[in-house]
Amino acid sequence: MLGDAQQLELGRCAPADIALTVAATVVSRQDCRSGLRRIVLDCGSKILGSDRPAWATGFGRLIDHADARIAALSEHHATVVWPDDAPLPPVGTRLRVIPNHVCLTTNLVDDVAVVRDATLIDRWKVAARGKNH
């Protein structure tokens, strides 16, 4: 119904079909001469969940940055390997992350912000938050 990165990677939906993303902020960036380019986002396993099927290429995807991959998660941060041919976003940039498994993300939050055209239009309380027993 909402779509997620697993469905996207399987080709069952397009990025435009994804109805739920996580707003994340770039909190660090690294552009090494050795070629390692990455950013760190302020969203980790406590918001994205840690599900990663063996066939998945990361722990989530980024809207508008199809070649970027979330390579690692800690509780509060996501490390994103950034493509060589794209400029690294500055610290403070807000990015939209598609979680691998949208069910986990909605189970991990108290409410969902409903945004249309960058404007907050509603907030939905997650009535079943944490009720997976």
Swiss-Prot record:
Top-rank taxon: Bacteria
GO molecular function: D-serine ammonia-lyase activity
Gene Ontology biological-process entries: D-serine catabolic process
Cited Gene3D superfamilies: D-serine dehydratase-like domain (2.40.37.20)
InterPro entries assigned: D-amino_acid_metab_enzyme (IPR051466), D-ser_dehydrat-like_dom (IPR026956), D-ser_dehydrat-like_sf (IPR042208)
Protein name (database record): Uncharacterized protein Mb1449
Originating organism: Mycobacterium bovis (strain ATCC BAA-935 / AF2122/97)
